[in-house]
A protein has these predicted regions:
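Amide-donor transfer/coupling interface in amidating biosynthetic enzymes
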Residues: 1-71, 89, 95, 99, ...
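Short, glycine/acidic-enriched capping/hinge loops at junctions between secondary-structure elements
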Residues: 50-53, 79-82, 115-116
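Short, glycine/charge-rich beta-strand/loop segments that flank catalytic centers
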Residues: 70-74, 144-145
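N-terminal beta-loop-helix "entrance" segment that forms/cooperates
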Residues: 73-86
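Feature marks short, surface-exposed loop/turn motifs that line or immediately flank catalytic pockets
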Residues: 73-76, 109-111, 238-240
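Cysteine-nucleophile active-site neighborhood
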Residues: 105-174
Length: 309
C-alpha cells in the first residue's frame, strides 16, 4: 500500500518520478482501508526537503499510511513560503483532540542552545506530553531525540568540541529487538550534530534500551521496552547528497567545518559521495511501522491506552 499525501505537495511529483508508491486522498478512500495515521512535527528549516525524505521512507511499506504535518505556533519558519505552510501544515491546537498511530519529531540545527532557550520549547514540551496519551509510538530524530530524552528521562546533552559529521559504522546491540530485525550486525548511518549524550545517564536509566551504537558516534538507536518511545541520534532519512550540501554550504559561509567522515571517496569533496545507509534507513521505518505501529495500535484509536512508564 502507498503513502497518502496531498497531490499538490512538492514531494508528490518527486517521489512519483522515483517510482515511489504514493497516493492522493481521493484514490485512497476508494480502497476502504483504515490507513495508519502518522503525525510529523517538522522542526527542520528545510521543510520541503525533510517532507520528501521522510515520505520516501514511509512509503516503503505494504501498509497504507496517511501523513499529517505539524508546525509550531510559537516559531514561524523563514525558510519556507507561508503559502506552503498554510496549505500543508497544522498547529498543535488544531490536532490536540485527535489521536495518531505514530509520530515523528524531527531534528533542528539548534544544538548550541539550552533547551529552555529555544523559543518553542514550552510548546514542544506540551506536544511531547500529548504523545503519551494520544500517539501509540513516537520516533524522535537527532535534536528531537536529544530533546525527547531530556524531557522524558532527564538525560542531559553534551556539547561537542568538534561536529560529529559524516557516515559512521554502527553495531547492533540487541539483535532480537523487532526494530532492528533484518539489520546487518554492522551498518552505516549519517550524523550531523554539535551535541551528544551523557552515556552514564543513559546506563543509569532503567527505562531505556540501546539497540545500536557506534564506537565513534556513540548510541544511535534507543527505545523504551514497549517501543512506544524511540530515539534516533542520527539521520537515516538523509538522502545521498544532504551531507554534501551541508558541507559546501558551511565552506561557502566560512564556517569551521571538517570534511564529513567516511563519505567522499578518499575524502575528496570533488568526488561523488558514497550512499551506504539507504537500505537500513528504509528498514528502520518499515520495522517501526510494522512491529510498533500496525501490529500494536488498536483499530479504533479512541481505545488507545495512555503510555505507562
Amino acid at each position: 500500500m502507498p503513502l497518502i499525501i496531498p497531490k499538490n505537495l512538492p514531494a508528490y511529483d518527486e517521489l512519483q518520478q522515483e517510482n515511489v508508491f504514493v497516493m492522493h486522498q481521493e484514490r485512497a478512500m476508494s480502497q476502504h482501508i483504515r490507513p495508519l495515521r502518522i503525525l510529523i512535527l517538522n522542526l527542520m528549516p528545510t521543510k520541503i526537503v525533510t517532507e520528501t525524505q521522510l515520505a520516501r521512507l514511509l512509503a516503503n511499506s505494504p501498509l497504507q499510511v496517511q501523513v499529517t504535518f505539524l508546525q509550531t505556533a510559537t516559531h514561524s519558519t523563514t525558510h519556507t513560503a507561508p503559502e506552503h505552510m498554510k496549505a500543508f501544515y497544522k498547529t498543535f491546537d488544531e490536532i490536540r483532540n485527535e489521536r495518531f498511530d505514530g509520530m515523528i519529531i524531527t531534528g533542528a540545527p539548534i544544538e548550541d542552545l539550552d533547551y529552555e532557550a529555544v523559543d518553542y520549547w514550552d510548546e514542544l514540551c506540551r506536544i511531547m506530553d500529548y504523545t503519551k496519551e494520544n500517539v501509540y509510538s513516537t520516533i524522535h530524530l537527532c535534536w528531537g531525540a536529544l530533546a525527547g530524552l531530556y524531557y522524558h528521562f532527564g538525560i542531559p546533552k553534551v556539547h561537542l568540541d568538534k561536529k560529529m559529521f559524516g557516515v559512521f559504522e554502527h553495531h547492533v546491540t540487541r539483535p532480537s529487538n523487532p526494530l532492528v530485525r533484518g539489520f546487518d550486525e554492522v551498518f552505516y548511518a549519517p550524523h550531523s550534530r554539535w551535541a551528544g549524550l551523557d552515556r552514564a545517564a543513559i546506563d543509569a536509566c532503567g527505562d531505556l534500551r540501546i539497540l545500536a551504537e557506534s564506537d565513534t558516534a556513540g548510541p544511535m538507536l534507543l527505545s523504551t521496552e514497549s517501543g512506544r518511545q524511540i530515539f534516533v541520534i542520527g539521520h537515516p532519512e538523509y538522502d545521498k547528497y544532504t551531507l554534501d550540501k551541508e558541507y559546501k554550504r558551511d565552506v561557502k559561509a566560512g564556517k569551521p567545518i571538517n570534511i564529513p567522515c567516511n563519505y567522499y571517496p578518499e575524502d575528496d569533496p570533488a568526488r561523488d559521495p558514497l550512499f551506504r545507509w539507504r537500505a537500513h534507513g528504509y528498514l528502520l521505518y518499515t520495522n517501526w511501522l510494522n512491529y510498533y505501529v500496525y501490529q500494536d495500535t488498536p483499530y479504533d484509536l479512541t481505545h488507545l491506552e495512555a503510555l505507562e512508564k
